Amino acid sequence: MGANMDDYTRMGYSPEAVCEYVMTLLNSNYEEWHMQNPDKNYRDFPFSIKKMSVSGCLFDFGKLNDVSRNILSGMTAEQVYDGLTGWAAEFDPEFAAELTRDPEYTKSILAIGRGGKKPRKDLAVWSDAKPYMGFFYDRYFAVTDSIPDSFSREDVNAVLAGFLDSYDEGDDMNVWFEKIKRIAAALGYAADMKEYKSDPQAFRGSVADVSMFIRVAVTGKMNSPDLY
């Protein structure tokens, strides 16, 4: 693997992720077993020397990152908070101070998109957290992405004005998104993606584009946790 556990810790990999990945290298049937036993961890696996590869194995960082995303996405917000702040305290003290200034606020951020059948898998290593969630903190907010020039400034400004005028903190997700769809339709953007895909030339864009305008304005990024 070319590195010891301290190196992987410094890079931000959780020990659980590294151990999980190593098991996929050591025993050819580990992944199949884990799919059949999703609630168990590598310590429960019936390891067999007979299942070890006789030709050795190649380390693959891409596969490690995939495994790590699965591991971190399956953690609770509390577990992610503990792992992230523990890593940051040693390797990014300034970030650790921001994270721990208001633990409940940080945990509420980490809870976004977590749980359910399809949890978000944005984090592969703890060091991914700052660029991913930094916009929630004044110290780290920065506009890193811009709205493509193919969209008119007038449309963008109209969307943002409409969003501000209609925003109500008490709205649930469905009401919130319905308002965005109405803004889109009023400006000639398709409110329904199926309708847009069937005849894209009939619209100025889609509700996905309108949502992107809002996302970039609020977060400075094209990719972020769920805006709602």
Name the predicted role of every residue range.
Residues 1-142, 219-228:
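Catalytic adenosine-cofactor/nucleotide-binding cores of aminoacyl-tRNA synthetases and other
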Residues 4, 48, 60, 125, ...:
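A diffuse structural propensity rather than consistent per-protein peaks
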Residues 5-6, 65-68, 85, 161-164, ...:
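Amphipathic alpha-helical segments within well-ordered protein domains
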Residues 8-15, 74-78, 150-153, 157, ...:
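Generic detection of long, well-ordered alpha-helical segments
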Residues 17, 63, 80, 176, ...:
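Residue-level detector of well-ordered alpha-helical segments, enriched
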Residues 47-54, 143-148, 166-167, 206-213:
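Short, functional N-terminal and low-complexity linear motifs
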Residues 99-184, 190-193:
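Charged, gly/pro-rich, cysteine-poor intrinsically disordered low-complexity regions
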Residues 178-228:
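Charged substrate- and nucleic-acid-binding regions of tRNA-handling and nucleotidyl-transfer enzymes
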